[in-house]
From Swiss-Prot:
GO terms for biological process: translation. Gene3D superfamilies: 3.30.1320.10. Keywords: Ribonucleoprotein, Ribosomal protein. The keyword Ribosomal protein applies. Residues 111-131 have a biased composition (Low complexity). It comes from Kineococcus radiotolerans (strain ATCC BAA-149 / DSM 14245 / SRS30216). It holds the Pfam family Ribosomal_S16. The lineage of its organism: Bacteria, Bacillati, Actinomycetota, Actinomycetes, Kineosporiales. This is Small ribosomal subunit protein bS16. GO terms for cellular component: cytoplasm; small ribosomal subunit. PANTHER family: 30S RIBOSOMAL PROTEIN S16 (PTHR12919), SMALL RIBOSOMAL SUBUNIT PROTEIN BS16M (PTHR12919:SF20). InterPro entries: Ribosomal_bS16 (IPR000307), Ribosomal_bS16_dom_sf (IPR023803). Belongs to the bacterial ribosomal protein bS16 family.
């Protein structure tokens, strides 16, 4: 049985995301898979790549062949270099950090409204403690 590591298309029309799966090469693209080993979402900025590295190493070790697209993703995450014993096993993919800035609102009216209630309770406590 020839086993491939390939992309399984999911999502809606014009909004695809992919599961990285291990499947028999004779099965259809979106058909039955043996195991799901990752996710790839090209629609986010930057693209999201999640790979179960242990399972990828296992399947590559037992002879599963990645498709060209999956091989490119594995090179970005560093799993291909780790399997081949090449330098650069840390990969070039960086996990996107959470955006800590508050959303920018035109006019800034909502941002001021959020700050005003925070100041009001502090002022209300001061006169109460003086009495």
């Amino acid at each position: 049985m020839a086993v491939k590591i390939r992309l399984k298309r999911m999502g809606q029309i014009r909004a695809p995301f992919y599961r990285i799966v291990v499947a028999d090469s004779r099965n259809k693209r979106d058909g039955r898979s043996i195991e799901e080993i990752g996710l790839y979402n090209p629609m986010t900025d930057p693209s999201t790549i999640e790979v179960k590295s242990e399972r990828v190493q296992y399947w590559l070790g037992v002879g599963a062949q990645p498709t060209e697209q999956v091989a490119a993703l594995l090179k970005v995450t560093g799993d291909w270099q780790k399997f081949k014993g090449l330098p650069g096993a840390e990969g070039t993919y960086r996990v996107p950090t959470a955006n800590t800035k508050p959303p920018r609102i035109p006019g800034g009216g909502a941002a001021k409204a959020v700050e005003a209630p925070a100041e009001a309770p502090a002022e209300a406590e001061t006169p109460a403690s003086e009495s």
